[in-house]
Structures are given as structure tokens and as C-alpha cells.
A protein has these predicted regions:
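Catalytic center-proximal scaffold of phosphoryl-transfer enzymes
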Residues: 1-263
Length: 263
């Protein structure tokens, strides 16, 4: 499964907290998923854990993720491109709208992004390789204008960037300006998801289990559980009956995902 994920064109990356191991420690479940494969691992949110998860070091496709800085580390310059999760951006613009209730730019940016996502879904559902320029260009222009207005209305606080707290929304606006390609990559290629919802769905059972079971005392057993979940989730994505797949695995005839067709 890990190899097939690293060979994929697009992979979604996400992470969520998990209480595992000794009391007082916080771990993360890391995920790397595609429409056909899922992989979950236990680690931290640091670069070392990202490397040990062993997807990003060998993956050369397009990574879909949130704005977390470690996804933009110089160690991953071999990636083909990034797609920022637009669901996260929409939530961030909601926060900005609450911080600046009289401002127009947060809602304008949201309308533009939602319009592009809707156009993406329509294009993909009808087999189009991209959103047509006639549809996307006005929405992109509206998004850019919203970002420019926001930058003008929310000036940066002076001082060293690493130590100076910025006003609400300023970092978001700078991200959308400086990494516009990462925000809007999906508009010219319908193979690229505009959101990372597929990764968030994959992590949801982990949070549910946490609410039921509480802290998981053994990190080793927790990783074993995540390995099993990776296998079951991948089976499910291939239309394999889960109970049948588990039975076959226990009787020595495990299902294996098919190799991708040569291109």
C-alpha cells in the first residue's frame, strides 16, 4: 500500500491528535490517502515523524494538505506541486469575517472559492480535464481582488516576521497572495482535489475510537491497529467486502491491491 501511494499522482496528507502511550504524552495519527489507498501511522507533527512515515521522502506527485508549515519544508522540494485544502481556507476566511464583521473581502473570497469548487465538481463529473477559462477566470479575478483588498485593509505589524504576531487574517491573506498557485492548482486539472476531505474522513474513526476507549496505553499496539485500519480502508475503497477480506487474511490468503496499469 505504501509503495502504491508513493506512485500516485495525487495524495492527501493530514494528521490528528491521539492520546496514546504514557499519560501526559500527545501523539498524532498521520495519514496519506488517495481514492484507492489509505495509510495511517503513529508519530508526531515534526519533520522527523513526517520522514519516518516514509511517504513524503519518496513521493514525487502532488500533495494536498492544509497550510501547516512542515509540508513546505525544503526537504520536500522534489514534490511536483502542492494543493492547499480549500475547506481549511474557507474556515479561515470565516474566522476573518468574524474578526472584521464590516469587511467585504472575507465573504467575497469564500464565494469565489466555493464557485471554483462547484465548477470543479461539474467539470470532473462530466469528464472535463479542467474548468473552462470562461467559468474560472471571473472567479479567480474575484478571489484575487478580495485578497488584495484584505491586504490593504489588514496591514502587517512591523517587526521580525518570526517573532511579530500579525493581525487576524494577515497570514492567511499573505499565503493566498504568495502561494496562489497552490490555492488554485485544481482549476486547471480535475485530477487534483480542491479539498482534503478524503483525508479528514479517513481520520474520523480514530477520533470516534478515542472518545469510546480513551487513552491507548501501548504505542506498539496502536500502530498495529492503524496498520489494520490501513488495510481495511484500502479494501473498502476497492469494493472488497471487509469481513470476507479479514477472513481471507486470517486463513492465509490475504487480498492485495492490484498493481496500477502501465502508462
Amino acid at each position: 500500500i505504501k509503495t502504491l501511494i508513493t506512485l500516485s499522482y495525487v495524495v492527501g496528507f493530514d494528521e490528528t491528535t491521539l492520546r496514546a502511550g504514557p499519560a501526559g504524552t500527545k501523539r498524532y495519527v498521520l495519514s496519506a490517502v488517495t481514492e484507492l489507498y489509505s495509510l495511517f501511522g503513529l508519530g508526531g507533527r515534526d519533520l522527523g515523524s513526517f520522514r519516518d512515515f516514509d511517504i513524503l521522502p519518496d513521493f514525487a506527485g502532488i500533495a494536498v494538505h492544509d497550510r501547516y508549515q512542515n509540508y513546505y519544508n525544503e526537504g520536500w522540494t522534489h514534490l511536483a506541486a502542492h494543493q492547499a485544502c480549500c475547506s481549511h481556507l474557507l474556515r479561515d476566511f470565516t474566522d476573518a469575517a468574524q474578526a472584521y464583521p464590516d469587511a467585504v473581502w472575507p465573504e467575497q473570497a469564500q464565494r469565489a472559492l466555493r464557485g471554483l469548487i462547484h465548477a470543479f465538481n461539474q467539470a470532473r463529473d462530466t469528464g472535463q480535464p479542467e474548468i473552462t477559462p470562461l467559468v474560472r477566470d471571473p472567479l479567480i479575478s474575484s478571489f484575487r481582488h478580495a485578497v488584495r483588498v484584505g491586504l490593504a485593509q489588514v496591514p502587517a505589524n512591523p517587526g521580525p516576521r518570526s517573532r511579530t504576531k500579525q493581525p487576524p487574517g494577515r497570514v492567511l491573506l499573505e499565503f493566498c497572495r504568495d502561494r496562489e498557485t497552490d490555492v488554485l492548482l485544481f482549476v486547471t486539472d480535475t485530477r487534483i482535489w480542491p479539498t482534503n476531505n478524503i483525508s479528514e474522513r479517513g481520520l474520523r474513526p480514530t477520533k470516534t475510537q478515542q472518545k469510546i476507549s480513551g487513552r491507548l496505553p501501548s504505542e506498539i499496539i496502536t500502530q498495529d491497529r492503524l496498520d489494520i485500519r490501513s488495510y481495511i480502508d484500502t479494501m473498502r475503497k476497492h469494493g472488497v467486502d471487509v469481513l470476507t477480506g479479514i477472513r481471507d487474511a486470517l486463513t492465509g490468503n490475504p487480498w492485495q491491491p492490484p498493481l496500477p496499469a502501465p502508462t
